[in-house]
Amino acid sequence: DALDLERIDRWARTTATGERAELTPGVTDGAWEARSVTGDDCTRDGCPLRSTCHAYAAHDAAAMADVVVTNIALLLMHLRVAGETGRANILPRFDVLVIDEAHELPDKAREAFGLTMGRGAFFMVEKWLRGGKKGGKKNVPPTDECAEILRWLSRDADALFAAAMARMPSRCRGVDAQGRTEHVTLCEPGWYDGDAVMHWLRRVREEAAKVAGSREDGDPECVRAQNTSRRALQIMRAVEELTQLPDGLVSAEPDVRRVYWIEADHAPRRHRTGPRITFRGAPLAIGPTLRRGLWGMEGLRAVVAVSATLTTGPGPGGWTHPRRELGIPDDAVTLAVPSPFDYARQSLLVVPGEAWEMPSPVAPQGADRTRSDERYTAACARVLLDTIRAADGRTLALFSSRRALTLAAELVRGASARGELPAGVRVLVQEPGASRRELAETFKADVRSVLLGLQSFGTGFDPAGETCSAVFVDKLPFPSRGDPLMEGLCDAAGDQWFGREYLPRMLLTLRQWVGRAIRTRSDVAAVVIADPRVGQGPGVGAKSYARDVCAAVGADVWGRGRGMPITTDLDRVRALLGVDAPPRGAR
């Protein structure tokens, strides 16, 4: 981290914004935290550096602006603070709100209005108890009692997270976690006795009150003590909620029900052994919260929510899911704008036919799931190789899981090494730790390259032009039923779980993925979905919702010459893209 600290120091002397994104390449979180100040440490107007603070400069500039551009996370923080305190002071006053990519708002709102607590939540309190360095001396605790409180609070906080880890499946505690993120739902009120942690947090607030009471308002030490007291109170409320589960999954009414879970993240990190444990909680129904806090915000003249994938498909039925999730008022005006693209001329949808002999993407009951998944992914890789040949490279392949991506990448690289791909085609893979930005730039620059990636390349990625002449989808991107939030939403929906929650979420994700294909009026691209559940012809396991899936991505399901033509013939991809067939006998 020493080199990163030096880079930050040099950059800090010249930056005009203070935004971390300016640092290229990036720096470690540890180095950034060593040089940055969190909101808990900020002494506000009492800071001697107030006049040169980048955060205050940005806030002051926004207050004077006619138009303010921010992100959804900051908007939701503004709404939450307004709801909790009655004062909306995160953003300057506004009377018209335009939300882009509004399809992302519900899940981000669940996170913003939910609960997240990792071991790091205690660090700010422990830092204050430890005392800051003064005059080059060692750390000096604010009061004589702080050292004892620190010792016992740290011990009991560690015990809380150890108890959480003990509830995880045994596989999460082994050496074969392989970077996975695992979850366990909390549904037993009183599963842990948090009284000890609560006791020491109350003691923190008592000591903080002593310090704040002995200083003048605005004094930096007074502000730090007040911030510490607020943070301790936040942790107390979180611990109480997580251990008592007041809203449970059984007793609460649907509109106020919340789900709680423990998350174990096994991603490798420097200076860390074992998984990172995080407690999370989220409301199931977020629509009522958004209806009150967003659409019903006092002083607003208009709210405009826009997205290329706001609805789940054409027709009035496509608005059912977004209306409920976004809390859109009944009297709001909704408008689905036709696409500016000529999909009938510019694109092609390729789905499995009987000749593809695709196995089921879902393991039969009682079958070995791992072996079944490997068999399906191997079949997908075969189709992907045919797609790459038909498109002469120029393919973005999106996979629904890390395991499928890894296996498919191995098979595609093997085929490339054996000379089974067109000469000069470069294979790029989104491997753990790989820079998404660098992969995206390389894919765009190398027109005939192939990129195998996960969901992050299915959204917010603009590969316009010839470089993305084919989009390959290995499997319909249904959400994981193992995700605690998804499990809670499906349980709350009862017998209607598939049509109410599961299918709409898949359709929205798939629409995003397919949207990578055609970005301008001059683009020409094919979309290949390898999942036989949307296939055509006898012997293909197409589902009753196959037509809904095709309609959602703009396909010509009624054969009227409007929308993407549908075919099971990969050779039509060559014709669409103007790629010559290989010589007879060539692979």
Please give the residue ranges for each predicted region.
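A substrate-engagement module of RecA-like helicase motors
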Residues: 1-68, 73-76, 127, 133-144, ...
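A contiguous, basic/glycine-rich beta-loop/short-helix subdomain that forms a polymer-engagement track
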Residues: 32-68, 76-88, 211-347, 351-353, ...
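Conserved phosphoryl-transfer catalytic core
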Residues: 102-103, 107-185
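Conserved RecA-like ASCE P-loop NTPase motor core of nucleic-acid helicases/translocases
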Residues: 304-308, 393-400, 529-530
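Conserved RecA-like P-loop NTPase helicase motor core
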Residues: 352-374, 431-535
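Conserved interdomain hinge at the start of the Helicase C-terminal
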Residues: 355-400
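Conserved helicase motor "Helicase C" RecA-like lobe of SF1/SF2 P-loop NTPases
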Residues: 400-431
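N-terminal targeting/trafficking signals and adjacent low-complexity tails
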Residues: 528-587
